[in-house]
From Swiss-Prot:
Homotetramer; dimer of dimers. This is 4-hydroxy-tetrahydrodipicolinate synthase. Pathway: Amino-acid biosynthesis; L-lysine biosynthesis via DAP pathway; (S)-tetrahydrodipicolinate from L-aspartate: step 3/4. InterPro entries: Aldolase_TIM, DapA, DapA-like, Schiff_base-form_aldolases_CS. The active site is at Y132 (proton donor/acceptor), K162 (schiff-base intermediate with substrate). Signal peptide: none annotated. Belongs to the DapA family. GO terms for cellular component: cytosol. Keywords: Amino-acid biosynthesis, Cytoplasm, Diaminopimelate biosynthesis, Lyase, Lysine biosynthesis, Schiff base. The gene is dapA. It catalyses: L-aspartate 4-semialdehyde + pyruvate = (2S,4S)-4-hydroxy-2,3,4,5-tetrahydrodipicolinate + H2O + H(+).
Length: 296
């Protein structure tokens, strides 16, 4: 089971190309600062702007650089089931420990279609699957009854969920419908504390890109049932959680990384553009609040 602070890693670019050297340094920095697993090629990693060859190279580099120190949950989502399987096949071959598979987006399948999609993936690859529910982006909601059906149908294949629905009742729905063994990970940093209280065991995090040690310590406090410490760390991180979405993501998180980690610049791929001035001010203020930046 995966648990703790799991960054949804940014994909660094330089002059329009994947900056492999910066990414390797980011992987090392994350592991050195307590991240318990890594997710390349998720939403924050701008996976939708990567060619398949680039997508696979990012996963491959992440697995190589992690070198078994922490597990890699490879972003394998697609609204084309065969393309999702292609990503899973590559990820399995290169040594990833699991696949993060988002609900098919844009084509808006029914719940029956969602079940068919994930069933096909589970039946045609041995890589464990973490479902990813983010209806605000996909316009498709993996309903609790669908999650429960999939988890019961494929108990060794569909092992968990990253839920970014914003609905905290889902954690209890899944826990009661499937059991404690089902790995529930928050997909919303600002809801990680109440999600953990309800039965989640960690967070696939945007903020952890920038504040890996604080996020890891926060998750450790939750796991130890040290509510006072968890609240203290959550309060430190709270403004940063919201600053990461002050403008279209991942613009703010790349700006924040450029402030605290010299190897990462703000380069994004169109249609994403660098964050606006208001977002920069919010990020700077949040970094100061978290003790990660001193302004002159």
């Amino acid at each position: 089971m995966f648990s703790g602070s799991i960054p949804a890693l940014v994909t660094p670019f330089r002059d329009g190309a994947f900056d492999e050297k910066a990414f390797r340094r980011l992987v090392d920095w994350q592991i050195e600062n307590g991240s318990s697993a890594l997710v390349p090629c998720g939403t924050t990693g701008e996976a939708s702007t990567l060619s398949n060859a680039e997508h696979h190279r990012v996963i491959e580099v992440c697995v190589e650089q992690a070198a078994g120190r922490v597990p890699v949950i490879a972003g394998c989502g697609s609204n084309d089931t065969m393309n999702a399987l292609l990503h899973m096949n590559f990820s399995k071959k290169c040594g990833a420990q699991a696949a993060l598979c988002v609900a098919p987006y844009y084509n808006r399948p029914s719940q029956a279609g969602i079940i068919a999609h994930f069933s096909y993936l589970a039946e045609h690859n041995d890589l464990p699957i973490v479902l990813y529910n983010v209806p605000g982006r996909t316009v498709t909601d993996i309903l609790p009854e669908t999650v429960c059906e999939l988890a019961k149908r494929y108990p060794d294949k569909i092992i968990g969920i990253k839920d970014a629905s914003g609905d905290l009742s889902r954690v209890t729905d899944h826990r009661m419908g499937i059991g404690k063994h089902f790995c529930q990970l928050s997909g919303d940093d600002e809801l990680a504390l109440p999600a953990n209280a309800a039965g989640a065991v960690g967070c696939i995090s945007v903020t952890a890109n920038v504040a890996p040690r604080l996020c890891a310590d926060f998750q450790a406090a939750c796991a130890a049932n040290d509510l006072e410490k968890a609240r203290e760390l959550n309060d430190k991180l709270y403004p940063l959680h919201y600053a990461m979405f002050e403008d279209a993501s991942p613009g703010p998180v790349k700006y924040a990384l450029s402030r605290v980690f010299a190897d990462i610049n703000e380069d994004l791929r169109l249609p994403m553009v660098p964050c606006n001035e208001a977002a920069r001010k919010a990020v700077d203020a949040a970094l100061v609040h978290a003790g990660l930046l001193e302004l002159a």
